[in-house]
Amino acid sequence: MSRSQKNDNFIDKTFTILADLILKFLPTNINAKKAFSYYRDGMSAQSEGEYAEALANYYEALNLEEDPYDKSFILYNIGLIHASNGEYVKALDYYHKALEANNKLPQALNNIAVIYHYQAVKASEINDLETAQALFHEAAQYWKQAIKLAPSNYIEAQNWLLSTGRL
């Protein structure tokens, strides 16, 4: 039984039934349907903090999914898990892969900026000011791209860019 079929609450059960019906009648190939099922199970596991299970499902979905747009969200979610686990290099790699598949993914741009900003703050704390400035610059570049795609989002980033003279 897939994870999504084990949901307890009414909303999750309703969503699962509707998603299963859509999958059943959607005119798409079997691999795309399987990929979506793994993706959905990955999201469910991720929302419950079951990151190992989520990653296993996302990797299965990634192997089956052919559509670059859909693949970008799988890659993005893998990046989220690595970032949550403090694996920032891996997270950056997956966010960049997500952007290669779909360059209009502001949340990936934002998360890359957040990681660079975090690393810049850490570099500042140990007085590595040259590295800090380079990382702050990278963060600014990614936030500018994210804001360009989603102007009403990332207000804190916009304020930081303004207050530091980067916007």
UniProtKB/Swiss-Prot annotation:
The keyword Repeat applies. Keywords: Chloroplast, Membrane, Photosynthesis, Plastid, Repeat, Thylakoid, TPR repeat. The keyword Glycoprotein does not apply. It is found in: Plastid, Chloroplast thylakoid membrane. TPR repeats lie at residues 35-68, 72-105, 120-153. It is a peripheral membrane protein. GO terms for cellular component: chloroplast thylakoid membrane. GO terms for biological process: photosynthesis. Pfam families: TPR_1. Essential for the assembly of the photosystem I (PSI) complex. May act as a chaperone-like factor to guide the assembly of the PSI subunits. Belongs to the Ycf3 family. This is Photosystem I assembly protein Ycf3. The lineage of its organism: Eukaryota, Rhodophyta, Bangiophyceae, Galdieriales, Galdieriaceae.
